[in-house]
């Protein structure tokens, strides 16, 4: 699975790790993240992420 990077702050979403602090289990692909998921660092929406 591809990693995605926030173009605002540089946070990298790694599907292998997920975002457990925000209820996203490891193994969750970027495309499967909830529509209202935001960058856990800066709050940017999914639309501000690009493939790493």
UniProtKB/Swiss-Prot annotation:
Q: Name one GO cellular component term.
A: cytoplasm
Q: Which part of the chain is the Rubredoxin-like domain?
A: 1-52
Q: Which domain of life is it from?
A: Bacteria
Q: Enumerate the subcellular locations listed in this protein's record, separating them with semicolons.
A: Cytoplasm
GO MF terms listed in the record are: electron transfer activity; iron ion binding
Keyword Iron part of the UniProt annotation: yes
Biological processes annotated in GO:
alkane catabolic process
**Where in the sequence is the signal peptide annotated?**
none
Keywords of the record, alphabetical order, are:
Cytoplasm, Electron transport, Iron, Metal-binding, Transport
Where along the chain is Fe cation bound?
6, 9, 39, 42
Q: How is the cofactor bound?
A: Binds 1 Fe(3+) ion per subunit.
Its needed co-factors are:
Fe(3+)
What the entry lists under InterPro entries is as follows:
Rubredoxin, Rubredoxin-like_dom, Rubredoxin_dom, Rubredoxin_ET, Rubredoxin_Fe_BS
Pfam families in alphabetical order? Rubredoxin
Give the protein's function: Rubredoxin is a small nonheme, iron protein lacking acid-labile sulfide. Its single Fe, chelated to 4 Cys, functions as an electron acceptor and may also stabilize the conformation of the molecule.
The similarity comment for this entry is:
Belongs to the rubredoxin family.
What's the protein called, per UniProt?
A: Rubredoxin
Q: Which organism is it from?
A: Nitratidesulfovibrio vulgaris (strain ATCC 29579 / DSM 644 / CCUG 34227 / NCIMB 8303 / VKM B-1760 / Hildenborough) (Desulfovibrio vulgaris)
